[in-house]
Amino acid sequence: MNNLVVLHSLDNTASVTLEKGELVSYLKNNEELIHQKGNPGWRNSDTEMFPIIGPSKENKFIVTTPKGNYNQDQHGLLRELDYSIENQTKNTCVFKKKYAAYTAIENSKFPEKSPIKLVSWPYNFTFKKSIALTNSSLKITFEISTEKGMPFMLGYHPAFMLNGNSNEVVTSNSQEISIPEIQKGGDTAFPVLNTSEISLVKKNGLNLKIQTKGFHNFMLWTPATNMLCIEPITAYPYTGGKMLSKELFNISNGVDVFEVEITPY
């Protein structure tokens, strides 16, 4: 697969760059909206969390399924797989990952950040990430194909660029959240629950509205003032008590589709 894919809106006011399926740039009217890899904060610019969200350390890295117990590290094994390109046009691209049930995958967090060397999952799945850059927005669609009844959690983890002055706010419904408030959330992130829409409001530059289908919740996370992760999630995992209880999991319908639309304004 070509490491870099560059898409352009039909009116040429926006472009998107993807590196091995990772969203590394979204330029709108020459303004960069995505956190740049190598800058302080986070070493990535986006990733997907599947089939779990959050840490499994509290459960000794074990996740219980109807087919038994399997090792999973933080945010699941999907990130350990490589994307291939299914098709591409000027303003669209479809990436795909496939996993064969029970395949042991090397955990990239081992040994520096995790004692678990291999992770696995007892279900086949195909995971598609479709990118469509329109004149007004960036649409990202996730399609998960697997057997009916598979438990799963899904989260999308993009990082957006901030100006470093901590004067941006996040709004959702009647809630207004500052960057310092989000930072106090630490590694468990700041939950914004039971909503499908959220906005990043800036003093300078383009604001962002994020609308979703299928997720219904968000987490906000940043270790720095120059970036912010606004993460659509199916469930907030840091609920106290037993981690990753079965109530946090969706149950597959065979094919499940989730959407994220990012609109600069």
Regions picked out by a protein language model, each given a short descriptive name:
Residues 1-137, 150, 161, 165-265:
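Surface-exposed acidic/polar loop and edge beta-strand patches at domain peripheries
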Residues 139-143:
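Internal active-site segments that recognize and position negatively charged phosphoryl groups
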Residues 154-160:
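Surface-exposed beta-strand/loop patches in extracellular or lumenal glycoproteins
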